[in-house]
């Protein structure tokens, strides 16, 4: 993999060049191996060197990747921040949406290893400044809709102001507060290859409070009512929580949720985001990465759409205060059945006195508070024990997770600003010693990707709950297959998949190491 990210950063510090780009883990050609797609930015001024180019690499299955950008048609040349992946036409092939500074782009997968630019015909080419997004089936009609987080409105030279130290002739990136916010977008999939923007119509853009410097988006059932909700990390604005009403509309629960601000009522610099059950009560917590001087926030799920900032008690606050956090994940990296926390760090400024541009990443293992039965959970910093990458600083941005070598352990891919990426193969001894199963969900009545499905696994006396989510992290997309760690158990005694349609799939006695394609029953669940 010879990709090198280009941000377009110059001494003028044009704001869009600060945020970097993401990466996607996807099986673009249907051969069962996870491929890699990297996004790049570019220079903004007309006389500058030009725009970056996205690159697609095919997994050859022997630890090597082949650049297939030209042959695939995915060589987008533009200022790309985020990658959103989903099968929007339910044909079994992942399609790709790109969030850009400038017109967004949509590529339809033709099923033969090539993509067609279908931006215009699909109606997805909004000309603003988008950063991230998520596919989800908001109205449960069986196809994927699309939420797009817009960062704001910024253009050169109108918005190119000096921020920094004039006496020292040092120019820094301006605060996000200097960037005008704009409404975010929601596209309803019409089922015929076209989309209709309808954010205001369905409750996602009815008033100015629905504007924010949007970054990461996660689509998941956050209040345990069987409907897929939306949570959006905003940079120096309140984070949004929209609860699904079940009729294709949403209720804004931002202010009442407890997940909009930190525990002191301050908005933070929300960037990366994930949702996962870290304490074993069956409800997904929310995790948001933030700027230096703040901390990465863990909101404990109290049920019924209410959350509380419990970051210090979970052990995630102090370690994150010095760093600028970006892409992230609550992912089980040792297959013990408990999600760990990974964060990619890196400052925006490369010339600020007293501040380093490159910063070390963070990895926290999810561990019991003590040895007593039924003890609660907390996180323990583990970066000293997990490899040389964690011992050195990097200018990290987007992060994606996936099993690149099909050994049952989640690997990590980081897109670095103005540098080559990191591909971190998971060689954690516990990941191979613990049990695991891998589920590939195939919807029939529900969307084919199974986004919105809830999975319950019984193994070794534990009940493990996971969801097939949309979005997560920042600017990036993950392996669509679900790996569930079983800990010391050698089989999953029971696996239950609850589909968005209401259908239920049940499996019993699934041995560790199994990869199971779970196809949704086609009958009417209410019949």
Q: Where is each model-derived feature located?
A:
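Beta-propeller fold detector
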Residues: 1, 66-70, 116-120, 196-201, ...
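Hydrophobic beta-strand segments that make up the repeating blades of beta-propeller
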Residues: 33-40, 91-100, 146-150, 229-234, ...
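Beta-propeller blade signature
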Residues: 54-59, 182-189, 243, 300, ...
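Repeat-based blade/solenoid architectures
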Residues: 2-22, 50, 72-84, 123-134, ...
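Asp-box/WD-like beta-propeller blade repeats and closely related beta-sheet repeat scaffolds
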Residues: 68-85, 98-138, 148-177, 181-183, ...
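Short, conserved, GDST-rich strand-edge loop motifs in beta-rich repeat architectures
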Residues: 39-51, 151-179, 343-358
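Gly/Ser/Thr/Pro-enriched helix-cap/hinge segments flanking short amphipathic alpha-helices
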Residues: 8-10, 315-318, 349-352, 356-370, ...
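Beta-propeller blade termini
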Residues: 20-30, 58, 80-90, 94, ...
């Amino acid at each position: 993999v010879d990709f090198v990210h280009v941000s377009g950063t110059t001494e003028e510090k044009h704001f869009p060049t600060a945020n970097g780009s993401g990466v996607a883990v996807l099986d673009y050609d249907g051969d069962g191996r996870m491929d890699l797609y990297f996004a790049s930015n570019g220079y903004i001024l007309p006389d500058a060197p030009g725009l970056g180019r996205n690159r697609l690499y095919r997994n050859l299955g022997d630890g090597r990747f082949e650049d297939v950008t030209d042959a695939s048609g995915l060589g987008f040349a533009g200022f790309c921040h985020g990658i959103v992946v989903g099968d929007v036409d339910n044909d079994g092939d992942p399609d790709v949406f790109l969030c850009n500074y400038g017109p967004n782009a949509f590529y339809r997968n033709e099923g033969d290893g090539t993509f067609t630019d279908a931006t215009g015909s699909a109606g997805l080419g909004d000309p603003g400044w988008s950063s991230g997004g998520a596919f989800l089936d908001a109205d449960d009609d069986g196809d994927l809709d699309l939420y797009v987080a817009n960062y704001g409105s910024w253009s050169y030279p109108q918005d190119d102001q000096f921020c920094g130290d004039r006496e020292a002739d040092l120019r820094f990136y301006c605060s996000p507060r200097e960037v005008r916010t704009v409404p975010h977008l929601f596209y309803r999939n019409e089922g015929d290859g076209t989309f209709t923007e309808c954010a205001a119509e369905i409750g996602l853009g009815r008033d100015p409070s629905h504007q924010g410097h949007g970054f990461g988006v996660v689509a998941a059932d956050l209040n345990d009512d069987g409907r897929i909700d939306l949570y959006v990390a905003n940079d120096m604005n309140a984070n949004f929580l929209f609860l699904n009403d079940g009729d294709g509309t949403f209720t804004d629960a931002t202010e009442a949720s407890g997940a909009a601000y930190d525990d002191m009522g301050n908005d933070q610099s929300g960037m990366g985001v994930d949702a996962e059950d870290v304490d074993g009560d069956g409800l997904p917590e929310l995790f948001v990465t933030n700027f230096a001087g703040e901390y990465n926030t863990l909101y404990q799920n109290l049920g019924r759409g209410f959350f509380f900032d419990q970051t210090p008690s979970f052990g995630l606050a102090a370690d994150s205060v010095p760093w600028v956090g970006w892409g992230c994940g609550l992912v089980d990296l040792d297959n013990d059945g408990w999600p760990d926390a990974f964060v990619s760090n890196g400052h925006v400024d490369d010339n600020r006195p007293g501040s380093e541009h490159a910063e070390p990443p963070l990895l926290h293992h999810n561990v019991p508070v003590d040895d007593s039965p039924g003890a609660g959970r907390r996180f323990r910093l583990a970066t000293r024990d997990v490899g040389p990458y964690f011992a050195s600083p990097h200018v990290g941005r987007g992060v994606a997770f996936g099993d690149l070598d099909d050994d049952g352990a989640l690997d990590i891919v980081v897109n670095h600003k103005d540098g080559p990426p990191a591909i971190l193969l998971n060689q954690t001894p516990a990941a191979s010693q613990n049990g695991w199963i891998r589920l590939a969900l195939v919807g029939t009545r529900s969307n084919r990707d199974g986004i919105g499905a809830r999975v319950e696994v019984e193994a070794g006396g534990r009940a493990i709950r996971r969801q097939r989510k949309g979005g997560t992290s920042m600017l990036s997309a993950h392996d669509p297959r679900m790996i569930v760690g079983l800990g010391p158990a050698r089989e999953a005694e029971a696996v239950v998949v609850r589909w968005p349609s209401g259908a239920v799939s049940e499996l019993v006695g699934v041995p560790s190491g199994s990869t199971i394609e779970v196809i949704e029953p086609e009958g009417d669940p209410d019949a």
